[in-house]
Amino acid sequence: MSRYRGPRLRIVRRLGDLPGLTRKSARRAYPPGQHGQNRKKRSEYAIRLEEKQKLRLNYGLTEKQLLRYVRRARRVTGSTGQVLLQLLEMRLDNTVFRLGMAPTIPAARQLVNHGHVTVNGRVVNIASYQCRPGEEIAVRDKAPSRKLVENNLQYPGLANLPSHLEFDKNKLVGKVNGVIEREWVALQVNELLVVEYYSRQA
């Protein structure tokens, strides 16, 4: 399954706010479609599926990519759900987004893919790169790169910088000081239901 490229507000109306996908909020509180207001009682499977879709669409992942992250999380000691969120939050595209360099994760991914971002002084154009504590995430020292990010900083995606990050707006340099804590994950999701969804596949 490829990344979602359709209308974003339809997804937000169905799943709730997805801060990584879009800054817009749905005006209507019910899902799209002719029968959107007449929701039947959902099965446990449908609830788990919805939580999985939230996670996948918010971080802009394919089905295969998310399954790989679940498998990686299972191999790490600790709560699989929490480790899964940490792996996704520490991706380079998400870190660029959380630093405020881009208004959404898709926009941050584009910055990374086009070579506008450096890690410890070297250009890294792999959006899935896992950021580690102590690393410096900066805008490439080129006029087009700086102009892009300076424009983005006027309309940040999220107001609050997570406690594990710091960012110098004048130098356009950020630093990863640790691993994100659960309370700083902006997406409202039940990660345990996502792990349960994949329990037979991972």
Curated annotation (Swiss-Prot):
Keywords: Ribonucleoprotein, Ribosomal protein, RNA-binding, rRNA-binding. PROSITE patterns: RIBOSOMAL_S4, S4. It holds the Pfam family S4. The keyword Calcium does not apply. Residues 22-43 are annotated as: Disordered. GO terms for molecular function: rRNA binding; structural constituent of ribosome. One of its GO terms (biological process) is ribosomal small subunit biogenesis. InterPro entries: Ribosomal_uS4, Ribosomal_uS4_bac-type, Ribosomal_uS4_CS, Ribosomal_uS4_N, S4_RNA-bd, S4_RNA-bd_sf. The keyword Ribonucleoprotein applies. Residues 90-152 form the S4 RNA-binding domain. One of its GO terms (cellular component) is small ribosomal subunit. CDD domains: S4 (cd00165). Belongs to the universal ribosomal protein uS4 family. NCBIfam families: PRK05327.1 (NF003717), rpsD_bact (TIGR01017). One of the primary rRNA binding proteins, it binds directly to 16S rRNA where it nucleates assembly of the body of the 30S subunit. Part of the 30S ribosomal subunit. Contacts protein S5. The interaction surface between S4 and S5 is involved in control of translational fidelity. This is Small ribosomal subunit protein uS4. It comes from Trichormus variabilis (strain ATCC 29413 / PCC 7937). The gene is rpsD.
